[in-house]
Amino acid sequence: MSNILIIKHGSLGDIAQASGAIQDISDNHPNDDLYILSTKPYYDLLKKNPNITDVILDKRLSRFNLIYLYLLMRKLKKYKFIKVYDLQNSKRTSFYKNILFPKAMSDIWSSTETTLPEGTSKIDFDKDTVLNRFEHQLNVSGIKTNHVTKPDFSWSCEDISEIKKKYNLNKYLILFPFSSSHLTIKRWPYYNELIK
């Protein structure tokens, strides 16, 4: 049995979108322990994911906080991960790669950087949908994908029937139209129409 690391920070929507990729990684590593490096808002939520052995907290402090980086890298190295799936694909996680596995290719560190299609720039590649990018990344990394393009986030649900009954909420529907304040292009403009 070996240890596998998945990295996913981001927003709740990012976590939901990555659920299919995480399930595919788990299905392809049935005898391994899967750990996910994520942030405090999603720590407890990700602990409920049946495909994850445990969650490792990344406080995402400044890269200039050398003490924090040293402690995080020391902690990660203790797990002796044989494979890392970087589903965040950010400058921060690329920086982590350069510290943990500086010479690793997709056989050790799976990311956009290590699986980019030949002759394609990252800017052009990033124009594709995130689920298609995950699928490409995992396929190049030897993962058979069945769930990546149809993520199942049902593992995150809670039974709220008692709350609904107590407060007579059966006739209500709650929408949470959250989006990143700096990524306005990702905002879905049809919530008002949906409500009507």
Which positions does each model-derived feature cover?
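Catalytic machinery of carbohydrate-active enzymes
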Residues: 1-196
